[in-house]
Amino acid sequence: MFKEIHVLGRSQIDELRQIAASAPFVDGRITNPHNKAKQNLQLHDAQAYQKSSNLLLQALMAHEDFRNFAMPVNIAPALLTRYTPGMRYGAHTDNAFIMLQPQGSLRSDLSCTIFLNDPASYEGGALTIQLGTSRMSFKLDAGYAIVYPSDMLHEVEPVTSGERLVGITFIQSRIKDSFQREMLY
């Protein structure tokens, strides 16, 4: 089950874009160097990371639809990621456990992508999720989030022009099993 939620207003989007424009990004494989499928850039500045993560997580938690759907116990810090032409993230499932600093871990039941660019500003770059024999594609308006089970096979299609800027995070839900969560929602 997927949930699309409008979580960011124009001023929040503008602030996140400004953070991204003024902070350094590095090869996304810095957090997973053995992942050959990952070809993107991620924010690499502690102060900008903290500010953008707080803004994104506060926006998510402010929405009753998100809280009712995800039933979060814990949410990983949100990370800004950028895709420029030629970049993609091949088919994968997200890690079952996310290590949190300085200690601990989070069971990743749900993944969340928050779109920060309008879809017309870049070509390609859709988030595609495998659902049995079907594929669902998401390229949402800026300010919208898509929440989906972390164990579903998904990918970011290659960006062919423009720039795809998103925030990503992972959620540990009160209800681990996606089928049980769907029945409750």
What do these predicted ranges mean?
Residues 1-79, 178-185:
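Non-heme Fe(II)/2-oxoglutarate
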Residues 65-184:
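Catalytic core of non-heme Fe(II) oxygenases with the double-stranded beta-helix
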